[in-house]
Amino acid sequence: MSHFVKIYDTCIGCTQCVRACPTDVLEMIPWDRCKAKQIASAPRTEDCVGCKRCESACPTDFLSVRVYLGRETTRSMGLAY
């Protein structure tokens, strides 16, 4: 099943989500709009197993990384198939 991983611009570049991911879905990329000058990116979403460890590791008040699982993706994102 395919999962959607969304990185929000509230990311502070701490790398906690990248280190928490057991399948190496996330990586940090350069980004000038935060103090750390980097932001999480999800280039390998096909490897996401939906464990949501990245969400649990995120220290921001509003989770900067969210994983939407299968049917949850269509409801949360307002999409219809």
Swiss-Prot record:
Residues reported to bind [4Fe-4S] cluster 2: C21, C48, C51, C54
4Fe-4S ferredoxin-type domain location: 2-31, 39-68
Gene3D superfamilies: 3.30.70.20
Entry keyword annotation includes Kinase: no
Localization of this protein: Plastid thylakoid membrane
Domain of life from the UniProt record: Eukaryota
Keyword field: 4Fe-4S, Electron transport, Iron, Iron-sulfur, Membrane, Metal-binding, Oxidoreductase, Photosynthesis, Photosystem I, Plastid, Repeat, Thylakoid, Transport
Cofactor(s) needed by this chain: [4Fe-4S] cluster
Note describing how the cofactor binds: Binds 2 [4Fe-4S] clusters. Cluster 2 is most probably the spectroscopically characterized electron acceptor FA and cluster 1 is most probably FB.
Membrane topology of this protein: Peripheral membrane protein
Binding of [4Fe-4S] cluster 1, residues: C11, C14, C17, C58
Catalytic reactions on record: reduced [plastocyanin] + hnu + oxidized [2Fe-2S]-[ferredoxin] = oxidized [plastocyanin] + reduced [2Fe-2S]-[ferredoxin]
One MF term in the entry's GO annotations: electron transfer activity
GO cellular component: chloroplast thylakoid; photosystem I; plastid thylakoid membrane
EC numbers, comma separated: 1.97.1.12
GO biological process: photosynthetic electron transport in photosystem I
Record's subunit section: The eukaryotic PSI reaction center is composed of at least 11 subunits.
Free-text function comment from the UniProt entry: Apoprotein for the two 4Fe-4S centers FA and FB of photosystem I (PSI); essential for photochemical activity. FB is the terminal electron acceptor of PSI, donating electrons to ferredoxin. The C-terminus interacts with PsaA/B/D and helps assemble the protein into the PSI complex. Required for binding of PsaD and PsaE to PSI. PSI is a plastocyanin-ferredoxin oxidoreductase, converting photonic excitation into a charge separation, which transfers an electron from the donor P700 chlorophyll pair to the spectroscopically characterized acceptors A0, A1, FX, FA and FB in turn.
Protein name: Photosystem I iron-sulfur center
Species of origin: Cuscuta exaltata
Organism classification: Eukaryota, Viridiplantae, Streptophyta, Embryophyta, Tracheophyta
